[in-house]
Amino acid sequence: MSEEEKVKLEQEEYSADSIQVLEGLEAVRKRPSMYIGDVNTDGLHHLVYEVVDNSIDEALAGYCNHIQVCINEDNSITVRDNGRGIPTAQHAKENKSALEVVLTVLHAGGKFNKDSYKVSGGLHGVGVSCVNALSDKLVAEIYREGKIWRQEFCKGCPQGDVEIMGETDRTGTTITFKPDASIFYVTEFKYDTLATRLRELAYLNKGIRLSLTDKREVDPETNQPRHEVFYSEYGLKEFVEFIDASREKLIENTIDINTEKNGIPIEVALHYNTSFTENVFSYVNNINTKEGGTHLAGFRRGVTQTLKNYADTTGMLSKLKFDISGDDFREGLTAVISVKVQEPQFEGQTKTKLGNTEVGAAVSQAVSAALANYLEEHPKDAKAIVDKVILAATARHAARKARDLVQRKSVLSGSGLPGKLADCADNDPANCEIFLVEGDSAGGSAKQGRDRQFQAILPLRGKILNVEKAMRHRVYESDKIVMIFKALGITPGTEEDSMGVNLDKIRYHKIIIMSDADVDGAHIATLIMTLFFRHMKSVIEQGYLYIATPPLYLVKKGKEQRYCWNEEERLRLIQEWGGGKESSLHIQRYKGLGEMNPEQLWETTMAPEGRTLRQVSIENAAEADRIFSMLMGDDVPPRRQFIEQNATYATIDT
């Protein structure tokens, strides 16, 4: 078959009749959260991901290698690819153009036809029709069969038939949409959120070039908008090296696996470092499976069994006096798993847990075979890994003793609550909140200013242990950390997960970090967040962790006074009240919480009706892990580079 005949056949396979329709679109505008998760920031950005996923599907099928995303000046989004273009011919069953079917009927598209796409991305799979339904305006431009086709929509309804606008020698699809402000609470796109996802997609789909442009932000020197290109030649290998950039390597090489088992394409990259945590990130059809699933279980089984067999065969574990667990084999392991599954079955609370049993066996076999070969060919690396396993097992044994001591103390000391804790009267965790307050003096003001019915105060003197650099038993031996565990009512480690916590015993559903608005305060808050991220991640995942935002300034003019939370507010108030002259106003800079009296602290930072809390969330686990490792680890150059890049956002006291 000639190349020309092959292209013609492919065009015929992806035609109007290959678009399958499964259900209507009526409910999307009434219940948007059912389709995109929520109508806040996550749901807003999910619209972009749905459109990009369509282009990625074209790339996976081999017809697209360049995807451009642009945030326009009016906060609309344009996604452009160089694929085949959505079919525009008349759809046999629907009696309208295939383009209109794709954009107005939920679950309509080539991804539901195996002849068009073998695998398809997108968690909810609702496609661009959902984006159309939730957009004030959407314009589709199709470059296909030598012509430019265009159709415009408003709130999901076509504003006319598809029209031919001209001729072209290119192919592809361009979708421009503006989210409906009557549906979304937030309509401003975050550059960094989109950049993180596009970078992730570039690593997961090597050889595809993705770009992001922000026309809202123009460089005054070059007069060019903010722009970034994401491209990975080596895929997951580069992804793991990016995540581990600030960690010290245990072995030099990243083990790269790219194979197919039982018809399932499997890609895995893994690397060992000197840290004390396991960081494994799993994906199915480009979807981040946050809850894991059979592919993750298969990977862990493959790593554990292969390393144990090697260590037993070489006699390296013969002198160890206690058992080794699977966790020990994976301490210091960073890995990314990506599988492509034709019919994925998702389970779990957020539908991000893979349930296909056949995938687990396939991944386990692939990892076992590749890792066994690597260990045989690299005995020096194999010894370094097994030595690390022995060290991890020894530390875990010590950690269990320390953890048991924490748990036993809690039982023997009655309520087990620390003496410094000023508890609240209410016993219902859903109503209660606890402030983790920097310093005893600020803790005193907070105790006096709080509402004793539902607000508890735990003062923390000085900095807590940096858990990023500490072995697990050191964490459980730290008095300050034990005090936090006891105050929250939870104990580290469960039967199912040594790194888990018994969240059903938690005493507060709002845990609020309250530290000074200076560099030391920010450092203390970061140390506490690192503790939660590494040892109580489920607290963050449940949405229980917050950061208080005390004001930076109190500005007075006569009898009038106003608080300012940042430098911009202060300058604006100087202009408004003082005509630009700071000398005509009395400005007090709060360097510490202790400088505020109890009434001021209550009014600005603690009163539910007047305060601003920032909820700590994990938008992207791999990115969060990389940043915590960089900020709190030993490697200085990446941290310096991060600070230099973000220096404009920091408030430095002199």
Residue positions per predicted region:
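GHKL-family ATPase ATP-binding module
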Residues: 1-18, 25, 47-49, 57-59, ...
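Conserved activation segment
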Residues: 25, 32-33, 99, 597
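Conserved short strand/loop->alpha-helix "switch" segment adjacent to the catalytic nucleotide/phosphoryl-transfer site
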Residues: 30-49
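A short glycine-centered beta->alpha linker in the GHKL/HATPase_c
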Residues: 85-90
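Short adenine-binding "F-helix/F-box" segment of the Bergerat
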Residues: 91-92, 99
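C-terminal interaction appendages of subunits in large macromolecular complexes
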Residues: 394-413, 428-433, 444, 448-450, ...
